[in-house]
Amino acid sequence: MEKHILSILIVTLFGITIFMVSHFFEINISHFILFSSIVMVAIYVIISFEIIHRTSIVFFGALILLIASLLVGIIHPKETLHFVIDVIDFNTIGLLLGMMIIVAVLGETGVFNWVGVKAIRLSKGNLWKLMIILCVFTAITSMFVDNVTIILLMVPVTLTIFRALKISPIPFILAQTLSCNLGGAATLIGDPTNIIIGSAANIDFTTFFLYMAPPIFVTFLLGLVLLKIIFRKELTTVVNISGQFKAVDEKSLIKDKSLLKSCIIVLAGVIFFFVIHGAIGIEASIIALGGAAILLIITRAHVEKILQDVDWATLVFFAGLFILVGILQEVGLIALLGKILIGITGGEPWLTFHSVIWISAITSGFIENIPFTTTMVPIIEILNSNTSINSLFGSLNISPLWWALALGAGLGGNGTWIGSSAGVVAIGISLKYGYKISFIRWFKAGFPFMILTVALASIILTLMILLSF
C-alpha cells in the first residue's frame, strides 16, 4: 500500500510540476520532450518493479501527459477528444475484443481441456517434448493467423494443461509467446506490424513470405535451442501421466458438442476472412467483432458471463499505451529518433540497414511495436529517398529497409512483454488464471532470446539481399 501511495505521489508531482512551470515559465518543445521522456521512464520503472498495476499506471501516465500537452499548447483543448480517438488504434482494440469473446464462448465447450490432454499424452510426460509441441504448433499457426488471435486461443490451452499437471506454466507461456512472435514475423498477415509495412511499401503476401520466411525458419530452430538452455532447470522434471490422464475419456471432456461445432464454423470463417481481409478491404477488427456477434446470436450464449471473461484490463492498457505513444509522436520525440538515425549513419546504405534493424528491435522491446512501426514508416520513406541509400538499394523492387523494419519490430517485441501485443495479451490471460509473470522474469528470458535471434536473422537476411543484386 505504501509503495502504491508513493508511486501515485511521484507521478502526480510530475503533473503538478509541469502545471506550475507552464504557468510561470515559457515552455518550448525541447523541454516538453524531456519531460515526456522522464514520465515514460518513470512509468516503465513502475511497471518493471510492479509497484502499481500496469493498466493503472499507463492510464494515469497517459492522463498526466495529455493534461500537460493541453497546458503547454501542444494539443488544442477543443481537439482533445479528436486527438485521443485518432491515436487509439481501434482496429487493434476491436480485434482483441472480438477474439476474446470468441475464445470465451469456445472455453465453455471444454475444448481446451481436450487439447491439453491430447498434448500431454503426445509428449508422454516429457516437458521438453511438450514445450516443442506447443511452440511448433503456435509458430506455424501464427504464420497464417494474427499472433494476438493465436495467443488468445493457445495460452488457455497451456494454462489448462499445467493446472492439471500442478506445474508452473510460466516458462511455457513465455516460450509459446516468443515462438508466436517469431512465427508471425514470417508472413504478411502474421503480425499487425507486417500488415502496416506491407500496406506502406505495397508488398504482396508471396514476396513478403519469400524474403522473411527463410531467416525466420532458421532462427526458430535456434530459438528452440535457446529455450532449452533458458528453461533447462524447469524442463528436467518428467511428469507421470500413467494415472489420471490415461484414464480420462477424451470425448467426455467436450461438454457441449453442438456449441463446439458452432464455434469451429465461426472461427474458421473468421480465420478465412483474416487471410483475405487485405484483398476485400475489411479491417480485421470488423471481422473479429462480426464473428463474435454471430457466435453470440446463434449459440444464445449467456452474454453477461461471456463479457465477464473478457480481459478489460488489457484493453484499457492498450488504449492508454496508444495515447502515450501518440503524444510522444505528436511532440516529435519518435521522429527525432529518425533524424538522429540519419545523422549517425550518414546515409551509408548497409550501416543504415543494420541500424534500422537494431534500433527497431531495441525500441520495440520497450514501446509497443504497432504504434512504433506506424511511426517508423514515414522515417523509412525519408531514408529511402536519401541519395546514397537510393543509389544502392534503388535497383531492387523493394527497399531492404522495409525488411529491416519488419525484422526488427517483429522480433524485437520479444525483449519484454510490453513490446508486442501478443506479450501483453499473454500476461493478461495468465493473470486471470492466477499466474503472475513479472516484467523482470520476462526480461531475463526474452531479452537475451531477442538479441540472439535478431542477430542470426539479420545475418541471413543480409546474405539474401546480397544475393538478390
Name each region found by the language model:
Residues 37-45, 63, 67, 97, ...:
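Generic alpha-helical transmembrane segments of integral inner-membrane proteins
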Residues 45-52, 104, 137-146, 177-189, ...:
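Transmembrane alpha-helix interface/packing and boundary motifs in multi-pass membrane proteins
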Residues 77-168, 313-393:
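Membrane-embedded alpha-helical segments and adjacent helix-loop junctions characteristic
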Residues 24-38, 88-101, 143-151, 186-187, ...:
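Structural signature of hydrophobic alpha-helical transmembrane segments
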Residues 37, 56-60, 93-94, 128-136, ...:
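Hydrophobic alpha-helical transmembrane segments
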Residues 1-29, 164-170, 174, 186-187, ...:
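Juxtamembrane and boundary regions of transmembrane helices in multi-pass small-molecule transporters
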Residues 149-160, 173, 186-201, 335-340, ...:
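Re-entrant/interfacial helical elements at transmembrane boundaries that shape
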Residues 43-60, 257, 261, 268-289, ...:
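Flexible hinge motifs at transmembrane-helix junctions and intramembrane kinks/re-entrant loops
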